[in-house]
Every structure is written in C-alpha cells, then in structure tokens.
Amino acid sequence: MIHPEEVERLRGVNVYLIGMMGSGKSTVGSELAAQLRFQFFDTDGLVEQVGGSSIAQIFAEHGEAYFRDLETQVLAQLSSYTRLVIATGGGIVLRPKNWSYLHHGLTVWLDVAPELIWQRLKRDPGQRPLLQTPDPQAALYKLMQEREPFYAQADVRVPIRSETSPPQLVEQIWQAIRARLRDGIPS
C-alpha cells in the first residue's frame, strides 16, 4: 500500500522505468502512476506520435539511429516535468545523453529473467524490430547481455523471476523505492 505522505518523499521527481522490451514497464507503469497520483507516459507511444508511424515502421523507413534521436527528444521534453512515471524504451539507456535526463529522477530497473522475457515476446515477435532475425531468442539474449551494465546504473533494481500480477509488481517496486528513499534520493 502506498501512502501519500511516503510519496511526498519523492520530492516531485519523476520515476523512470527501465529494462528490456517485454519487462512490463508499460503495463506496470500506468498502475504505479495511478497509485502515486503521478501522470503516466510511455516513451514508445510518444515516439510513435512524434514520428507519425509505428516503431516498426520508423525502424524500417529511417533506421535505429533516427528512432533513438526521437526517443532522446521525447525524454528531454518529459524530463522538464515532475511527478511522472515514465516507461522508457529498452534501449534508452544506451545513449549517455539520455542518462543526463534519467539522473534527474529515480530510475527503476525491472530486471526480468531472460526466459520470462522470451516467453512474453515470442507471442508477438513481429512488433519488435530488433528481434527480426533468423534466431530472435539468441538476438534477445545478446541484447540483454549488452544492456545489462547500463541497466545496472539504475537507482533501484527490482528482480523479477516469475510471472507476477501488476498489483503485486507495483507493491514490489514501491518497496524497493521506499528502501532507496531511506538512503536518500540520488542527485
């Protein structure tokens, strides 16, 4: 249970959810925002709005670098506000410039077991441009390995090793945030 007086300890900063595609950032982000009484934004959805097409189309027509530029632009705009929960794209951690925005808030890494992410993503791999390879599972595991050191820079790590309902995951995230708040918000 999230109490309003505890939320005040966040001092109006944003909560950035980071982690691999399929980790549940968008699903749990809206519920976390509702409980915190913050607004929720999903950078992928905003990139689609700014880019005027789906992420898959943006990748196909303009390439990954263009997509990452749009992602940075969206993140820069969101970081000028406070009291937001922001579900970020899985690769947002790759650009040092993005960390300059992420560090203005509290970053929470949803560290989901690789097998669990694969189980989720294989239901609909066509929506994931970076998995359009002959061996999408190997591509996923390679991406996870490459990105883990970046994700590990998060202020809070929430290990997820089995399917968890969104309300349970929100509680798990909140407990991890509370523990981090006891140590002080990073600056």
UniProtKB/Swiss-Prot annotation:
It comes from the Bacteria. The keyword Amino-acid biosynthesis applies. GO terms for cellular component: cytosol. Its EC number is 2.7.1.71. ATP binds at G22, S23, G24, K25, S26, T27, R128. Catalyzes the specific phosphorylation of the 3-hydroxyl group of shikimic acid using ATP as a cosubstrate. It catalyses: shikimate + ATP = 3-phosphoshikimate + ADP + H(+). Mg(2+) binds at S26. Monomer. It comes from Synechococcus sp. (strain JA-2-3B'a(2-13)) (Cyanobacteria bacterium Yellowstone B-Prime). Keywords: Amino-acid biosynthesis, Aromatic amino acid biosynthesis, ATP-binding, Cytoplasm, Kinase, Magnesium, Metal-binding, Nucleotide-binding, Transferase. It is an enzyme of class 2 (transferase). This is Shikimate kinase. Substrate binds at D44, R68, G90, R147. It is found in: Cytoplasm. Its cofactor is Mg(2+). Binds 1 Mg(2+) ion per subunit. One of its GO terms (biological process) is amino acid biosynthetic process. GO terms for molecular function: ATP binding; magnesium ion binding; shikimate kinase activity. InterPro entries: P-loop_NTPase, Shikimate/glucono_kinase, Shikimate_kinase/TSH1, Shikimate_kinase_CS. Its main location: cytoplasm. Pathway: Metabolic intermediate biosynthesis; chorismate biosynthesis; chorismate from D-erythrose 4-phosphate and phosphoenolpyruvate: step 5/7. Belongs to the shikimate kinase family.
